[in-house]
Amino acid sequence: MVTFLEKISERAKKLNKTIALPETEDIRTLQAAAKILERGIADIVLVGNEADIKALAGDLDLSKAKIVDPKTYEKKDEYINAFYELRKHKGITLENAAEIMSDYVYFAVMMAKLGEVDGVVSGAAHSSSDTLRPAVQIVKTAKGAALASAFFIISVPDCEYGSDGTFLFADSGMVEMPSVEDVANIAVISAKTFELLVQDVPKVAMLSYSTKGSAKSKLTEATIASTKLAQELAPDIAIDGELQVDAAIVPKVAASKAPGSPVAGKANVFIFPDLNCGNIAYKIAQRLAKAEAYGPITQGLAKPINDLSRGCSDEDIVGAVAITCVQAAAQDK
């Protein structure tokens, strides 16, 4: 069976996108860059000091990568001024802007903002906030997006559930305590993201510890309210809740717990009530079910600026870059 990574990589190859990788002090970034270039998935911009990059790379073939050093880049003043204009209402000075633009992640995100690259992948050596803060400050949310959020593509080997074992988990990386409205909006955009990346019809489960009233509390009431709002926002998308995980994916359990549900027993998009649940769930799937986990990938930003887990492999970075290419192409339309 062709894996999700293989499918998304083949799609990315046809798109001719350029992705910036700012964590050039981490060997995994350079290993991933070499693989991406060898496979023809994307053009790569490595942000950092050229001598340091080449010393760390050793025998890796990065000859096709463009290396951009924020300290010597000919457009650095343009970048500094652009950031100053974006953030001067917050009280920053040009000196502050110059210091911030010396940060490789901030610099890479500004490259995306100014159209010099199509997206950014970072997070192997930084916390999620170090990647997502520049994204929110510089590229901001996309037109029409209620909020930015983050998801994981989870691909479980030898799994009969979901879309041939592939699922989308959201929010698993960004919105800590979403409101009822936030969860509803995350559900709708996640369905559209799943369709874009996995190329299958989304079936969205609003997850809970309860199925269809089996328990009642403020927590279940919030999930029910989010479900109703999401259904109103996107009546053409199959969204249902509240559902426990077994009812969401196992047909026999669904028939017993949620008969007549358009989603139960066949869900492929999992919407969690908060970041605690979403993040715990993805790591359980990754570590115990040996699932491939790609993310946290952002949605709702004006440009694709994507995060990584600090425990990621070089192949995880390759996957995130391929996803970023597909997202960028979709935003071009």
UniProtKB/Swiss-Prot annotation:
Main site of residence?
Answer: membrane
Q: Which InterPro entries match?
A: P_Ac_Bu_trans, P_AcTrfase, P_AcTrfase_dom1, P_AcTrfase_dom2, Phos_Acetyltrans/Butyryltrans, PTA_PTB
Q: Which UniProt keywords apply?
A: Acyltransferase, Cell membrane, Membrane, Transferase
Location in or out of the cell: Cell membrane
Q: Does the record carry Membrane as a key word?
A: yes
Q: Which Pfam families match?
A: PTA_PTB
EC number of this enzyme: 2.3.1.8
Q: Which reaction does it catalyse?
A: acetyl-CoA + phosphate = acetyl phosphate + CoA
Instruction: Give a Gene Ontology cellular component term annotated to this protein.
Output: plasma membrane
Could you state a single Gene Ontology molecular function term?
A: phosphate acetyltransferase activity
Similarity field: Belongs to the phosphate acetyltransferase and butyryltransferase family.
Describe its partners and assembly state.
Homodimer.
Specify the protein name: Phosphate acetyltransferase
Q: Which organism is it from?
A: Methanosarcina thermophila
Q: Species lineage, top-down?
A: Archaea, Methanobacteriati, Methanobacteriota, Stenosarchaea group, Methanomicrobia
